Design a protein with these regions (language model features):
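Oxyanion-binding/catalytic loops of NTP- or PPi-dependent enzymes
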Residues: 1-86, 96-102, 114, 123, ...
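Active-site metal-coordination/substrate-binding segment of hydrolases
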Residues: 89
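Juxtamembrane segments of multi-pass membrane glycosylation machinery
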Residues: 110
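Hydrophobic alpha-helical hairpins/lids featuring a short glycine-rich hinge
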Residues: 116-118
Length: 638
């Protein structure tokens, strides 16, 4: 089996697998019964110790504040992302802006301690590796697993890919590849080393937190991905939420209550979070039961409290018919995404051989029914191992048995002065891809160039008719000296979604030996420092009170701050000396925009006025002192 494993890092459950003579899905005693192959993607804190998996999930009812679920929905996200703000109330644990970053980052909290989403994902990965090594040991293998192929949603943006890469490193894994989940499922279904049978698959991967659709052509061990689309906020979690909202409405109807959400918000904190935790557990149970039973009961041990503080028991029956009615709009949304991916590809529907269903949510009967109604019934197939297909495909790739062609999942854009939606890398390009572009400085003496990267969500725009531009990160270029307006900077942007995130290099076009200091920031402390530099420059420009020498000095210091900030991270770790240097230079720059500077300018102006108007009235000694003060103030202000 070796030292490499295939991992499906899921929203609700995660799976690890190996490939040797056959594909072997890892089992563990503390995994979810009955087959013990699913590891709950849940992390909890219990008496100061981290727990992962089923034991962590079992803590959700009694201590939901210290149980992290669905971290995959938060990884690589910013606190100010509109969808994050919309979804905050669904999480029982604390989520804030990162204390060491910008609004383009976020943190979760356990036991009063701040964690990055990558830290939580790393704990899940560590657990999977631990289970895999135990599983290997039972077969006589003693390899230390230190490499992995980790799967991600095909529609993940660059920032989410990068965050998954960081999580893998924090788990002690050398990441062989980030593999799109639908492609992994296609490999699991179609891999046959010596076959020359060509099949084109539309993979419908409906999981706990995301919906992905990809078109993949398979022949033998070769797989060509031609298009992909998805919704990163559509999955089993949303089925659960629909059930919870129904329960609230039913309790309100039964008890004659007007606004249940307001009542819940007014409950004592501990009772409120316990109630919400129990509702989540009960909704998930009901969802599973309704796949095989006509109805399910939702009962919580923690009651609701009405306006008078009286206990209102929660006991609601939901029928399969009602459940199907609730989730039908979500399923119809997923069908539209299938048609989107067909539109993005070169394949008409009649040239698609198989519509392959994988993922936990695809096992809900009404989901399968709606897909069979939307597409030719003879094309729709459920994967033989729908819950493990993605991990199996990752294991086959980890064994080095495939050849693949993949494409860019979505447009990569830069916000420019003359083009706020400049596409630097278009969706559908074959990976890896390298693009070149010339940018010109906008002003004489400009030392800094700021690029803002984002990725538009075309699928959501098609479905909701709203722009959903997902911010990826920022890049500041610091020139080595002032240059005239129109100076051309040649920028090279590289993307290989399998192994690396977005990379960017820059040099002066006419002086290629002059490399421009640059670093791509994704919400960390380097971005916060660079953001403050930009703010200080704006303040100085607004004040318009610097001499030409002062402007040059301010620009020079700003450039030094950026250069130091661009070196803060090395191998994704903070370099304390570079951080200190950047912070010191930032303080120096802040002095140019400070209140003390305005006071110094006031005294400089007053002293010069006194020397000019009252020259003959001032004692020579006093005059000399004033002249010295004016000189000192001039030097300080410059």
């Amino acid at each position: 089996m070796g030292n490499i494993v295939g991992i499906d890092l899921g929203t609700t459950n995660s799976v690890a697998a190996f490939k040797l003579a056959h594909t072997d899905v890892v089992t563990a005693e503390d995994n979810t019964p009955p087959d013990r192959k699913l590891t709950r993607s849940v992390v909890a804190l219990d008496q100061g110790k981290i727990k992962v998996g089923n034991s962590a999930y079992n803590q959700l009812q009694n201590d939901p504040e210290n149980v992290i679920i669905s971290i995959k929905r938060l990884i690589g996200r910013g606190f100010n992302d509109p969808v994050i703000q919309e979804q905050l109330s669904r999480f029982g644990y604390k989520i804030t802006k990162s204390t060491q970053g910008t609004d383009n980052s976020l943190s979760v909290w356990l036991g009063g301690k701040e964690y990055q989403p990558e830290d939580i994902a790393a704990e899940i990965l560590k657990k999977l590796v631990q289970n895999a090594q135990t599983h290997q040991a039972k077969t006589g293998q003693k390899s230390i697993i230190n490499q992995a192929v980790v799967t991600i949603p095909a529609y993940f943006n660059d920032k989410q890919r990068y965050a998954t890469q960081i999580a893998s490193g924090k788990a002690g894994l050398s990441l062989r590849e980030l593999l799109p989940e639908p492609t992994a499922a296609a490999i699991s279904y179609s891999y046959s080393a010596n076959s020359d049978d060509v099949k084109t698959l539309l993979v419908y991967d409906f999981g706990g937190g995301t919906l992905d659709c990809s078109i993949v052509t398979a022949v033998g061990n070769q797989f060509i991905e031609s298009a992909k689309a998805g919704d990163l906020w559509l999955g089993g979690d949303d089925f659960d939420h629909s059930i919870i909202e129904f329960v609230k409405q039913e309790v309100a109807r039964q008890e004659g209550l007007n606004n249940l959400d307001q009542l819940i918000a007014k409950m004592p904190h501990y009772q409120r979070v316990r109630l919400l935790g129990e509702l989540k557990i009960e909704a998930e149970k009901a969802k599973i039961q309704l796949s095989s039973q006509p109805s399910a009961e939702i009962i919580t041990s923690t009651p609701l409290l009405d306006e008078l503080g009286m206990a209102v028991p929660i006991q609601v029956t939901i029928t399969r018919q009602k459940f199907e009615q609730l989730i039908t709009p979500l399923i119809e949304r997923s069908v539209k995404i299938c048609y989107d991916v067909i539109k993005y590809s070169d394949y008409p529907l009649d040239q698609i051989d198989v519509i392959l269903l994988v993922g936990g949510s695809s096992q809900v009967p009404i989901v399968q029914q709606k897909i069979r109604e939307a597409f030719p019934i003879n094309q729709v197939l459920v994967h033989p191992n729908p819950m493990y297909a993605v991990a199996e495909g990752a294991a086959i790739v980890a064994a080095g048995l495939t050849e693949k062609v993949t494409t860019v999942s979505r447009d990569y854009c830069i916000e420019l002065v003359n083009d706020p939606r400049f596409i630097i890398i278009p969706q559908g390009e074959i990976l890896p891809v390298k693009k070149f572009h010339n940018f010109k400085t906008e002003a004489d003496g400009q030392r800094l160039i700021h690029f803002k990267f984002f990725s538009p969500d075309l699928v959501r725009k098609d479905l909701d008719n709203t722009d959903r531009d997902e911010r990826i990160g920022d890049m500041w270029l610091a020139l080595d000296q002032p240059y005239p307006r129109g100076t051309e900077v040649l920028v090279t942007v590289e993307l290989d979604e399998q192994n690396n995130s977005l990379q960017m290099m820059a040099a002066l076009k006419n002086k290629p030996e002059v490399k421009v200091s640059c670093s791509f920031s994704r919400g960390g402390i380097n971005e916060e420092i660079s953001r403050q530099v930009e703010q200080r420059i704006k303040e100085l420009n607004a004040a318009a009170n610097l001499t030409e020498t002062g402007v040059q000095n301010a620009n020079e210091i700003a450039g030094e701050v950026i250069k130091s900030a661009n070196q803060i991270y090395h191998n994704d770790k903070i370099q304390s000396d570079r951080l200190e240097a950047a912070q010191n230079k930032l303080k120096e720059l802040e002095n140019f925009a400070s209140e003390e500077r305005d006071i110094a300018q006031f005294y400089q102006t007053m002293f010069e006025f006194v020397l000019e108007v009252c020259d003959s009235l001032i004692h020579p000694t006093q005059k000399q002192r004033l002249q010295t003060l004016v000189q000192d103030l001039n030097q300080a202000l410059e």
